[in-house]
Amino acid sequence: MLSFQYPDVYRDETSVQDYHGHKICDPYAWLEDPDSEQTKAFVEAQNKITVPFLEQCPIRGLYKERMTELYDYPKYSCHFKKGKRYFYFYNTGLQNQRVLYVQDSLEGEARVFLDPNTLSDDGTVALRGYAFSEDGEYFAYGLSASGSDWVTIKFMKVDGAKELPDVLERVKFTCMAWTHDGKGMFYNSYPQQDGKSDGTETSTNLHQKLCYHVLGTDQSEDVLCAEFPDEPKWMGGAELSDDGRYVLLSIWEGCDPVNRLWYCDLQQGSNGINGILKWVKLIDNFEGEYDYITNEGTVFTFKTNRNSPNYRLINIDFTDPDESKWKVLVPEHEKDVLEWVACVRSNFLVLCYLRNVKNILQLHDLTTGALLKTFPLDVGSVVGYSGRKKDSEIFYQFTSFLSPGVIYHCDLTREELEPRVFREVTVKGIDASDYQTIQVFYPSKDGTKIPMFIVHKKGIKLDGSHPAFLYGYGGFNISITPNYSVSRLIFVRHMGGVLAVANIRGGGEYGETWHKGGILANKQNCFDDFQCAAEYLIKEGYTTSKRLTINGGSNGGLLVAACANQRPDLFGCVIAQVGVMDMLKFHKFTIGHAWTTDYGCSDSKQHFEWLLKYSPLHNVKLPEADDIQYPSMLLLTADHDDRVVPLHSLKFIATLQYIVGRSRKQSNPLLIHVDTKAGHGPGKPTAKVIEEVSDMFAFIARCLNIEWIQ
């Protein structure tokens, strides 16, 4: 029996907020100040019990050693052409950050173009976004430090990889779009704010602006091109049309797949970009998504979900843009979701569909929309693509649960459009033929069939004896497609585990209908779908509740925390990474206001009632039955997470330890680990990734008594 002495934590019982006549106590509101001595002491006290617990997990050393060994395989991106040169990203295996290489031809010698590993000693400075000028002679790139969303943009001359003096600050959630003359670039920035902006602050991000930077000038001289003073939450990203004539401005209000679309004809203004652009408001509502694909003169092709939840391709003529005049180029598919489209070799379109959570890649004719070819693909995901309108070739990258990656190359100038394997990677030490992946469709509470992938060793007995690791996300129209994960395969190989990934509602797996089925008033469907996935795994003999771990990050952290509250008896272990835990206040911090499109907002009485029912922070209660306790729980967060600020996890763990952890029947640990110089996830250095997964799987092994299998 494990029993814990948790830190004594001050509760401010006078901290009460009134929501529509409901008095809600918030005794740990003081943890919302990341800079107070009290918060720092709280974090230190929590890490003091968690770190030794993790370090004493018997398999942590074995796991970390194996992870370091198996993760040491080469990782490549697709090649992409810019100007006369080819570029690609490559990580030799264990480098903290991947390196950008350049070649003069596909057969030419590869040279390092930009190595982010040289920018910090510990790998915590990461590349976050980049853009080449149209002729491929200039390169803009964003850098973020310690995992923060704040970005500094710098510039290089491509010839000789020469650093330029230009620097752009106060940049976040930015576009990077060069005008075709190569003179400058559109980007987004936020107004100055009080206090610091290093990713440890919690202040809200409002009033994003679109600016134009002229190469060789100071940022103070940049031109303001669009702002929305009456709509502080709006964010507007610019892109240039393929012919360079039009600037297209997509305006988003939150995370819903809907945007306004304004444009400016750069040939109309004779004196260049010197102020707010003359925007034509082509689409001036939030009733659909319009994703620019290409244009032939004034006829523009968009991917849209307007009256087509699975998406279709339409043509809009800017000279006659009334909706009644729109033409359908590729109609909506009744089942498959159109994920992305690219124009290549001037008259082809590459379309990527999602069919039952597996990708399909097709070539169509730009003029007629007709299907020309379906590219052969195994069961899995297309995770990389390159090829633009002016290119005559494409590269695409495939991966699956058991294949780390194959990159294909297809020359579109040939009669026979046959892709060839350009590069294939294998991982030494994991033989894919020992394992199998199956997809099942299990019923949720309301009868909806939910897809789930299950990966396990071939020939296992379904006798309930296996530990299982169930992952889910369920939000923001994001589809969780098959991906290669060494850390999870080690669980399958060396911990005798079963890996399951449930494609619950809220995601985009079946288009906007699936997304809407798991948001706002329907958010409980996500939790029901996930709990039914767990019940399916138990019923079919893969595992038992005591041997089942659930895991999710961000919105998935909310998912697993809510499920632990609702069904503590159903899980043995819960690992919640950077989760959204305070559903009444999330919109007040950094970019949280953008998530109200999925969650709603407690400022509304109706939304407040939905949120209060499942908010992890507000639904912790000691199980009534004597033989039921909370599962072992590990929360993970980090000091520079300015997407989902750490206060969510801090307040939640304090509440768990107070309400549940003090009970004598609660022998399972309730712990948090707060990392430093780390953020929400993007750009995390390899060394930190290895430490994090070693902590996670060591915690699972210790709490569920799992032996290491050599």
From Swiss-Prot:
Molecular function per GO: endopeptidase activity; metallocarboxypeptidase activity; oligopeptidase activity; peptide binding; serine-type endopeptidase activity
UniProt keyword Transmembrane helix present: no
Known EC number: 3.4.21.26
Pfam families: Peptidase_S9, Peptidase_S9_N
Reactions that this protein is recorded to catalyse: Hydrolysis of Pro-|-Xaa >> Ala-|-Xaa in oligopeptides
Active-site residue numbers: 554, 641, 680
The keyword Hydrolase belongs to this UniProt entry's keyword annotation: yes
Protein name, as recorded: Prolyl endopeptidase
Organism encoding this protein: Rattus norvegicus (Rat)
Lineage, uppermost ranks: Eukaryota, Metazoa, Chordata, Craniata, Vertebrata
Gene designation per UniProt: Prep
